[in-house]
Amino acid sequence: MTKKIYLALALSSTLIIDSLLQAEESPVSKYDPLAITLADIQWGPPGGGNGAPVGVQTARQGTDPVTGGITYYAKFPAGSHFDKHWHTHDEFVVVVQGTVTIVLGEESHSVSAGSYVVIPGKLNHSWDVPEGEEDAVIVVRRAGPADFHYLDR
């Protein structure tokens, strides 16, 4: 019986050590390291219209190689409005600067820097940035490829 216990301990120790060695050799992620500040962002040209706020600027940070979901910054000018729309995939948002009023379904929420918002796929939502305040900057992470479906069209 003692030989069986020693054999079991030796086998399990070997498996644990082997898995630790493999973990050290295996890449942790397919992503490259990235650390970026708001001041470092390379904004795209102002765009918008056709439902999106006029003057909105974006800066893509990456695309998930498995889901096709993108991560990007978006800067909305003060006084701008994003028409009611929905996306197929879930959307995760962190407000980095400014204040945004977001309507999720039928509920309105005023969120400011540091706020986190989850927008389930297919949920109608719209955005407003108050007039006379600073531009709003958000970071968006999508769970799948981006698509926009506007309601009032």
Feature roles, as predicted:
Residues 105-123:
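Short acidic-glycine-tyrosine-enriched beta hairpin
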Residues 70-87, 121:
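Conserved short histidine dyad/triad with adjacent acidic residue
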Residues 8-18:
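Bacterial N-terminal signal peptides
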Residues 23-68, 153:
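A short, N-terminal "cap"/entry segment at the start of jelly-roll beta-barrel domains
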Residues 77-80, 87-105:
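Glycine- and acidic-residue-biased ligand/ion/polar-headgroup-sensing regions
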Residues 51-53, 65-67, 86, 94, ...:
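Extracellular/periplasmic catalytic domains that process cell-envelope and extracellular macromolecules
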Residues 28-36, 126-153:
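Double-stranded beta-helix
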Residues 1-9:
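Bacterial N-terminal signal peptides that target proteins for export
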